[in-house]
Amino acid sequence: MSVDKKWVIFDLDGTLANIETRRKIAKKPDGKMDWEIFFADKLIEHDEPNEPVIKMAQALKASGYNIAILSGRSKSSKQVTAEWLKKHGVEYNILKMRPTSHPWKFMPDEELKLGWFNDLFAGDENRDEHEVVCVFDDRQKVVDMWREIGLTCMQVAPGDF
């Protein structure tokens, strides 16, 4: 199989982007997360790059692999997200972000990403020629899902949330 049919999937928050500062700012006094603050564009644009993971994405892209970024982040942040990825030198073929409409808005990340994965090559008459080589993610539930469907998943950080 030629490398042009090979894909690597990356998560965004906690994987390509270090979100610790944003997480601290958005944490309420009771310890719960204020998701409106957490996903505010003005905070997203200041995320620090997770350099080792970004270097992997760059090396894989330079070697001819296709890059798909599947993020639970809202589609309403697509512009600031695309600008952040460009600023940090992350090239990609596909960027999927959570739709703002129901039922997608509240769907667990592992269900959302499995749905996207199942539709990734839909409509391509050569669908069976594509291969997902591996996945980079941080969230345990999502990592477990990738592994359950038989994909190799590189867990880049602890993600029990």
Predicted regions and their residues:
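Alpha-helical substrate-recognition element adjacent to the catalytic core
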Residues: 2-103
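Conserved Lys-Pro-Asp/Glu-containing loop-to-beta segment of HAD-superfamily phosphomonoesterases
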Residues: 4, 113-140
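Surface-exposed amphipathic alpha-helices with a cationic face
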Residues: 57-61, 118-121, 147
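Short, aromatic/basic amphipathic alpha-helical patches
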Residues: 81-89, 120, 144-150
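Short, surface-exposed, polar/charged, turn-prone segments marking secondary-structure boundaries
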Residues: 95-98, 127, 161
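Alpha-helical scaffold elements lining the catalytic groove of polysaccharide deacetylases
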Residues: 106-111
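Acidic, Mg2+-coordinating phosphoryl-transfer loop and its flanking beta/alpha structural elements
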Residues: 130-161
